[in-house]
Amino acid sequence: MLPGLGADRLEIVPGAWHLRHYLSPAEQLAIATQCLELGARDAGFCTPIVRGGHPMSVRMLCLGRHWNARTYTYEDVRSDIDGLPAPALPPDLARLASRAATAAGFALVPDLCIVNWYGASSRMGLHQDKDESRESLLSGAPVISFSIGDSARFLFGGLKRKDPVQKLLLESGDAFVFGGESRLRYHGVTRILPGTGPADLGFEGRLNLTFRQY
């Protein structure tokens, strides 16, 4: 049986699934180690500057394609950071994301991943993931989110910013999958709970990997 099935597989709304304890401790450690190693290299973790000149509160690593925080578009090089090519998306990470999509009833072959490293004071305001291609958005290709490290208070709303939101706790090893009719729902992170992650991961804070199909 795939991880995430059975009692730990919760449908939040049609098209959105919380797969609790989806990743094994060994998988969490392997993902954290790989992301930290990639993030320490050239074209590694950076602090994006958004429109208006304000830095985001997370550090970001883009794999497969780079997300430009000033233009809200994807590109092959980090033109808003250092001009370096975006690192490739490791096949083993892509396979894990495809497996999670299957566990939630979707099919996905991701070609990019955004890794956000949350510190104790990091937040992410309500937003839609809508910068992928028109074809991808129209098809409802899901976003696959993995949480590694400290727990996060997560909001999942509707198709309008002012719609009611559901409040969830995402813990280390959880996957959250949203696609189909829920693909463009607003979501965000209001709080990180320091010290709640597994002690053996080798870092502080929370790594959030979101896999997409451009």
Residue ranges and their predicted role:
Residues 1-214:
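Non-heme Fe(II) oxygenase metal-center motifs and adjacent flexible, charged/small-residue loops
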